Amino acid sequence: MEKSLEKKLINEVSTPFYVFDIDVLKMRIDYLKSMMPENVHLCYAMKANPFVVKEIDEKIEKYEICSYGEWNIAKKMGISDSKMVISGVYKDEISMEDILNNYKNREVFTIESLNQLELLNKLTKEKKKVINIILRLTSGNQFGMCEEEIIEILENRAKYEYLNIMGIQYFSGTQKKLSKRIIKELEYVDEFVLNLKNNLGFVVEELEFGPGFPVVYFEAEQDFDERTYLMEIANKIKNMKYQGHITMELGRSIVASCGSYYTKVVDKKTNKEGN
């Protein structure tokens, strides 16, 4: 941000306040895109900062929406349903029915559990509406479903008349500073997707992968070589057996660098060696 504009804001706006530099944000998105292979497309996790959604709409293919509240925000902003990934561990009947009633059903719904599968199967049957879904594969934590559950769903996929199963979602956490951890996860998911094709004849159209890129917050972390880190991950993606559509879900990694928080000192004192 230009210093003159910064000074103007400080003089005219009461602290505390946030400023989001949209030029910096757009450059960040362009940079991340340039570092990834062509089959990788970005999905912005709205929870990271919902205020910038409309500003980046032309540059982002998908939005991850993990609550009914976020969906209402996206709806008010005029976000196309075709760009929505309806995620989240909690999906209740009232909110899911409202979402199904409001759009043309071009969204993608994630399935975190067998209960969520049965809920959406029930609602779509009643409404005779076909929706797209992806199945979340657990990383071993409380989120998603185990391999056996996903395999069972796919073995019986013909009975889900109104659920178009497009693929797999995988996300294990965030702030992963070692590229080898993400590479290991990509290898695991790649092998699982290949097994689904070979053993069940199920071809994944959509792989949604949350890498959990780290955000540098403190001075001691400034030596993090992000370019090399991203190149190593991109190289792994290029050499995967799966070469279909990959949606890379990112939140803080996209938006963190564009924000500044302004406040003021209201008191000053010294205790021993600390101010």
Q: What do the PLM-derived regions correspond to, one by one?
A:
Residues 184-275:
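C-terminal active-site-proximal or functional interface alpha/beta core segments in diverse enzymes
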Residues 28-36:
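A short, N-terminal amphipathic alpha-helix
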Residues 3-16:
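Generic N-terminal amphipathic, Lys/Arg-enriched alpha-helix
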Residues 13-22, 42-44:
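A glycine-/small-polar-enriched, mobile loop at the entrance of the PLP active site in fold-type I
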Residues 9-11, 167-174, 210-215:
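A short small-residue
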Residues 40-206, 236, 266-269:
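Active-site-proximal beta-alpha core segment in soluble small-molecule metabolic enzymes
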